[in-house]
Amino acid sequence: MSLTEEATASEAAPESLAAPAVLSAEGLSSFQPPAGRVLLVWDAPNLDMGLGSILGRRPTALERPRFDALGRWLLARTAEVSSGRPGVVIEPEATVFTNIAPGSADVVRPWVDALRNVGFAVFAKPKIDEDSDVDHDMLAHIARRQSEGLAALVVASADGQAFRQPLEEIARTGVPVQVIGFREHASWALASDTLDFVDLEDIAGVFREPLPRIGLDSLPDHGAWLQPFRPLSALLTTRV
């Protein structure tokens, strides 16, 4: 091809270009809608301490929560949220945050592997000192998922100092927020106008046997204090 022919061909090229395609309404409807998450964050150190407080000792493996039952509960919660948002893909995400004390890796490994085997992601952090807890990591993960799109949030913890304010702020944006724990230790969640509380023992199958929680039908001979379900200050607020 001569230089003249090449120039002529390049001038004619724009005329041969096809017009840009126009995306039809039918084409738009074929796109996957934005996904949302139902996120579960489990504060393992805090809930382990709470369970130990109820039992009066360190819980055994058989006394710990069954995460397969918790996973089924989360799937049911995700289906419930999805039913209220037709056309939106809602996916569950189950996470456990824990500390690994020096020398305990071999003891904790079977538990971590069991969690991963039933679909839970585990964030493990060395327990070096008192400042190496996982509170910041849980809040950072929640913030990350919120920026990506949260359909609902479930936090299993009794740590009101760390969680109450950020969870209530998320709830005020319209995201349903639930707190899971033991009612004896979660008065801050019970008293909140924006958070829903679920007692861990009310989730079917989570515990193999009923917990030895003190009630009127199981009082020790020397008597016992029955703690309030919520603080007295809750009388100053009205639940909507």
Positions of PLM-derived features:
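Nuclease catalytic cores that cleave nucleic-acid phosphodiester bonds
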Residues: G103-R239
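Domain-level signal for Mg2+-assisted phosphodiester chemistry and nucleotide/NA-binding surfaces
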Residues: S2-S132
